[in-house]
């Protein structure tokens, strides 16, 4: 969701979404404002790919989630079984947001997230158990804005995660 000095704009809901079996297949320029995502699927956010029909859900209460997918080789995850998901959504900021600092708050993204706003890269976060917060003030404008997210199933930080939950 968005948060700024007590004002919030929730971005939960249906997002445009494209899932890729490998990171090599992903669209290189999906974050651009002129990119045509009309053929994309949609997905609820917050939500999990695996619980929405993408990839394979894995439940682990002992050991690592990637067991059987790739060998331990910290900090490098295997590229051959590393899914990618790309998300897009527009939102509108009216005059009441003018002059305010605007932050994007992502409660969780497994296992990492890269963020673009209006075609410009904002930042990257790599820890699915912690929230990510990005100052997007200089990237937003009055009126319609585009936010784009890219998430990989595995990343270097994946080696630090081993808990009892669905992945």
Q: PLM features: residue spans?
A:
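Ser/Thr- (and often Asn-) enriched beta-sheet segments in non-cytosolic proteins
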Residues: 10, 42-44, 90-92
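Accessory beta-strand-rich segments of carbohydrate-active enzymes
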Residues: 17-21, 26, 48-51, 55-56, ...
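Short Gly/aromatic-enriched secondary-structure transition segments
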Residues: 26-38, 43
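Short, low-complexity, polar/charged sequence segments that are solvent-exposed and flexible
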Residues: 34-37, 61-62, 122-124, 166-167
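Hydrophobic residues on conserved beta-strands that form the core of alpha/beta folds
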Residues: 11-12, 37, 87-88
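N-terminal pre-domain segments of enzymes
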Residues: 1-26
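Surface-exposed, low-complexity/disordered Ser/Thr/Gly/Pro/Asn-rich loops and linkers
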Residues: 52-78
């Amino acid at each position: 969701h968005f948060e700024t000095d007590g004002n919030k704009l929730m971005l939960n809901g249906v997002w445009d979404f494209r899932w890729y079996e490998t990171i090599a297949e992903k669209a290189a320029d999906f974050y651009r404002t002129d990119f045509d995502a009309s053929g994309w699927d949609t997905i609820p956010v917050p939500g999990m790919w695996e619980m929405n029909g993408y990839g394979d859900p894995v439940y682990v209460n002992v050991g690592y989630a990637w067991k059987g997918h790739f060998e331990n080789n910290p900090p490098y995850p295997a590229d051959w079984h590393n899914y990618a998901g790309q998300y897009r959504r527009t939102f509108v900021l009216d005059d009441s947001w003018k002059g305010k600092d605007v932050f994007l708050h992502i409660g969780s993204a497994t296992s990492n997230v890269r963020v673009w706003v209006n075609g410009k890269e904002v930042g990257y976060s790599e820890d699915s158990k912690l929230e990510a917060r990005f100052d997007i003030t200089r990237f937003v404008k009055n009126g319609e804005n585009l936010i784009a997210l890219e998430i990989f199933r595995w990343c270097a930080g994946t080696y630090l995660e081993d808990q009892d939950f669905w992945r």
